C-alpha cells in the first residue's frame, strides 16, 4: 500500500487507534485491503450504533451490496445456511443466505428497512423466525481468528468493532465511483476525508493485533 497516501492518517498503529475512536464516536471507517488482493475500500460501521443516515450514505456511494458481518455463533443462532455448499469465489467470501426483518419493514430496500433488518439480526435474543429469507441484507460469516486467519474486509470489520468495545457485528459496503467503477485507494482516501472517516488498512490491523498479542504474552 502507498504509505505516502496514508501518512496523513498517522502511523500504522495510530491508524488503527483512530479507527477505533471513530467507531466509538459513531462514525464510519474506510478499510483498504492489499493492492494485490481485491484492491478496494469498504465503508464499515459498528452495527450497534449505525444510523439511517449512514446506511443511506452507504447505499448511495457503495456497490449496493450491504453486508452484515457476523461470527459463526451468530450464524448458528439465526440458523442461516451458507449461500453455497462449495464456495468457489476467488477469496472464499463467507456469504450466507440473504435476510430481511420479519417485522417493521415494507419492501426491505430502503435505508431504514435495511437498518431494521440489521438490528433484528444482531439483537441479543434474536431468533431465526425474526428474519425472512431471502432479503436485501447480505450476511457474511467471518473466519475465527479474524485478520490473523484471513485478511479480508469481513474479518477486519469484526476485529475493529470488537476492539472498539462493540458486539461482533458490523456493516460493510464497497465504495464505488460515480461511474460505477470500483474506487481504489486514492478515491477512497478522498471520500474518507470528505465524510470524516479515518482510513486504515488490513495490514495495519494485522500489525496492531500481532503487537498487542505479543504484549499480552
Swiss-Prot record:
SUPFAM superfamilies: YrdC/RibB
Catalytic activity: D-ribulose 5-phosphate = (2S)-2-hydroxy-3-oxobutyl phosphate + formate + H(+)
Top-level division of the source organism's lineage: Bacteria
GO molecular function: 3,4-dihydroxy-2-butanone-4-phosphate synthase activity; magnesium ion binding; manganese ion binding
GO CC terms in record: cytosol
Chain sites annotated for binding D-ribulose 5-phosphate: 37-38, 42, 150-154, 174
Cofactors: Mg(2+); Mn(2+)
The keyword Metal-binding is assigned to this record: yes
Family as reported in the entry's similarity comment: Belongs to the DHBP synthase family.
Function: Catalyzes the conversion of D-ribulose 5-phosphate to formate and 3,4-dihydroxy-2-butanone 4-phosphate.
PANTHER family membership: 3,4-DIHYDROXY-2-BUTANONE 4-PHOSPHATE SYNTHASE, GTP CYCLOHYDROLASE II-RELATED
Protein name as it appears in the record: 3,4-dihydroxy-2-butanone 4-phosphate synthase
Organism of provenance: Enterobacter sp. (strain 638)
Amino acid at each position: 500500500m502507498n504509505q505516502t497516501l496514508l501518512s496523513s492518517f498517522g502511523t500504522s498503529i495510530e491508524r488503527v487507534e483512530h479507527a477505533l475512536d471513530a467507531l466509538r464516536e459513531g462514525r464510519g471507517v474506510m478499510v483498504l485491503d492489499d493492492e494485490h488482493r481485491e484492491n478496494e475500500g469498504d465503508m464499515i460501521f459498528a452495527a450497534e450504533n449505525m444510523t439511517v443516515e449512514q446506511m443511506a450514505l452507504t447505499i448511495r456511494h457503495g456497490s449496493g451490496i450491504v453486508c452484515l458481518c457476523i461470527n459463526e455463533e451468530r450464524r448458528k443462532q439465526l440458523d442461516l445456511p451458507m449461500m453455497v455448499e462449495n464456495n468457489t469465489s476467488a477469496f472464499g467470501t463467507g456469504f450466507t443466505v440473504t435476510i430481511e426483518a420479519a417485522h417493521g419493514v415494507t419492501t426491505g430496500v430502503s435505508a431504514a428497512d435495511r437498518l431494521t433488518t440489521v438490528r433484528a439480526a444482531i439483537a441479543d435474543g434474536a431468533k431465526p423466525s425474526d428474519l425472512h429469507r431471502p432479503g436485501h441484507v447480505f450476511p457474511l460469516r467471518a473466519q475465527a481468528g479474524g485478520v490473523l486467519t484471513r485478511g479480508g474486509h469481513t474479518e477486519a470489520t469484526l476485529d475493529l468493532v470488537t476492539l472498539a468495545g462493540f458486539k461482533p457485528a458490523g456493516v460493510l459496503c464497497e465504495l464505488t465511483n460515480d461511474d460505477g467503477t470500483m474506487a481504489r485507494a486514492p478515491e477512497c482516501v478522498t471520500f474518507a476525508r470528505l465524510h470524516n472517516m479515518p482510513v486504515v488498512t488490513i495490514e495495519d490491523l494485522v500489525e496492531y493485533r500481532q503487537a498487542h498479542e505479543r504484549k499480552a504474552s
